[in-house]
Amino acid sequence: MPRVYIGRLSYNVREKDIQRFFSGYGRLLEVDLKNGYGFVEFEDSRDADDAVYELNGKELCGERVIVEHARGPRRDRDGYSYGSRSGGGGYSSRRTSGRDKYGPPVRTEYRLIVENLSSRCSWQDLKDFMRQAGEVTYADAHKERTNEGVIEFRSYSDMKRALDKLDGTEINGRNIRLIEDKPRTSHRRSYSGSRSRSRSRRRSRSRSRRSSRSRSRSISKSRSRSRSRSKGRSRSRSKGRKSRSKSKSKPKSDRGSHSHSRSRSKDEYEKSRSRSRSRSPKENGKGDIKSKSRSRSQSRSNSPLPVPPSKARSVSPPPKRATSRSRSRSRSKSRSRSRSSSRD
């Protein structure tokens, strides 16, 4: 017997309301109400066709209902399904009948784009309308673009059937256009692939950046350590060099001072000798007094300049000998002169 599906029913609808709604379209054999939908069995198939054609989109208890031909074998309220005309039958649970059809949405790859959709048509209307071609798992309307919807089917055959039979049909006064959504699936796949690649690239970049940072830090630390070591070595070397140069320069200065003092003492000694020899013993007493004073003044003037204590010690012995010798000679000369004057 022909059966008709009624969708988007109000939860307050009763069986009497359904009978009134279908009155005038033949005799009703059975009315089966579910949560939000139901089934009506007609006695004549022509009455069922007329009801589907004229009552689809009409209001019932404040809700715009969908009326369409039911698909699949009939199932009773206990879950038993009766076979078709060829016979046969079996048991099917309610999960596979009602809850599977009208359960939570499931995304699949068998997707159709619905264009030229009426603004009055909601996603529930679109889903209920597309059920006549096959099992609809997901429906959406006016989400991404206005007057455009999305329908996803359980299998490829259901999608192909909807594309062949329902393309160009009228929903709420508009002829819809169905387009198979092939590029979007590939685009989404490539997008997910690019996402995973970009994430892996970001992770690898962050790891490489972290490794480069740690390497640069370790290199900078090793450089700073090597610099500090080189600085310490250079400082120790410079200190050693300074101490060596000081120790070397001190003996040089001492040697130079010794040599200078020796040369000065020798020169002064020779000068005093030559001056004392150049004076003649035949001069008068005045000349002797002058020569004594000159020799003393010259010896005093020729005596070395005041020198630091280290230099004075090294220079002092030779000039004392020279002055003592010159004084002794001058005294001997003065004695000899005084003797000669007394004899005269």
UniProtKB/Swiss-Prot annotation:
UniProt GO molecular function: pre-mRNA binding; RNA binding
Residues the record lists as Phosphoserine modifications:
45, 81, 84, 297, 299, 303, 314, 316
Domain RRM: where?
1-72, 110-183
> What superkingdom does the record give?
Eukaryota
Q: Which Pfam families match?
A: RRM_1
- Outline the segment boundaries, as ranges, of region: Disordered: 75-103, 176-344
**Major place of residence:** nucleus
From the UniProt annotation, give the residues forming the signal peptide. none
Keywords, in A-Z order: Acetylation, Isopeptide bond, mRNA processing, mRNA splicing, Nucleus, Phosphoprotein, Repeat, Repressor, RNA-binding, Ubl conjugation
Q: Which SUPFAM superfamilies match?
A: RNA-binding domain, RBD (SSF54928)
Q: Name one GO biological process term.
A: mRNA splice site recognition
Q: Where is the composition biased (Basic and acidic residues)?
A: 264-273, 280-291
Modified-residue entries (N6-acetyllysine), positions: 165
- Posttranslational modification, per the record? Extensively phosphorylated on serine residues in the RS domain. Phosphorylated by DYRK1A, probably in the RS domain. Phosphorylation by DYRK1A modulates alternative splice site selection and inhibits the expression of MAPT/Tau exon 10.
Complexes and interactors: Binds SREK1/SFRS12. Interacts with DYRK1A.
Family matches, as PANTHER family:
RNA RECOGNITION MOTIF RRM DOMAIN CONTAINING PROTEIN, SERINE_ARGININE-RICH SPLICING FACTOR 6
The family line of this record is:
Belongs to the splicing factor SR family.
The task this protein performs is described as: Plays a role in constitutive splicing and modulates the selection of alternative splice sites. Plays a role in the alternative splicing of MAPT/Tau exon 10. Binds to alternative exons of TNC pre-mRNA and promotes the expression of alternatively spliced TNC. Plays a role in wound healing and in the regulation of keratinocyte differentiation and proliferation via its role in alternative splicing.
What's the protein called, per UniProt? Serine/arginine-rich splicing factor 6
Q: Source taxonomy lineage?
A: Eukaryota, Metazoa, Chordata, Craniata, Vertebrata
